[in-house]
Amino acid sequence: MIKKIIFGIAILLSTSCFANSTTSDGSKKDAAKTNDITTQKIIDDFSAYAGTIKPEVREEIQKYRVAIVKINKKKRELYNRLSKEAQNFLAEQQKYKQKLSISKLTVENDQKNNTADSNDNKSKDTK
């Protein structure tokens, strides 16, 4: 179980780190070597940490994950029992929620940028 977790983390880290660590001049070999070292260090650190977890806690976590899988399966079954019209409505509703969250993030970022700009203008005015 722990090996699967470690392997999953390693894959995620290696793909994201590799994408972020490649340089613009194309020195992918150096980036890959650095990435491999970083990934291996993280895996070793996690293995050391996972070794300190009590067996009772591991069992508890495993039961939790099994329960989550059952819940997600039940959710899929419930969704599949809905009429096509209801499924389409939920899909459209999700699109609108995404638009709202993107819109909200844009507004928040604009407000932060405007606040930063106004603070910059104040400091320029006092000079």
Curated annotation (Swiss-Prot):
Residue ranges of coiled coil: 56-101
Disulfide bond positions: none
Species the sequence originates in: Rickettsia conorii (strain ATCC VR-613 / Malish 7)
PROSITE patterns linked to this entry: PROKAR_LIPOPROTEIN (PS51257)
Membrane topology, from the record: Lipid-anchor
Keyword vocabulary terms for this entry: Cell membrane, Coiled coil, Lipoprotein, Membrane, Palmitate, Signal
Main localization category: membrane
Region (Disordered): 107-127
Taxonomic lineage: Bacteria, Pseudomonadati, Pseudomonadota, Alphaproteobacteria, Rickettsiales
Covalently lipidated residues, kind N-palmitoyl cysteine: C17
Cleaved signal peptide residues: 1-16
Polar residues bias spans: 107-118
Top-level taxon in the UniProt lineage: Bacteria
One term under GO cellular component: plasma membrane
Protein name: Uncharacterized lipoprotein RC0077
Lipidation feature positions (S-diacylglycerol cysteine): C17
Compartment(s) of residence: Cell membrane
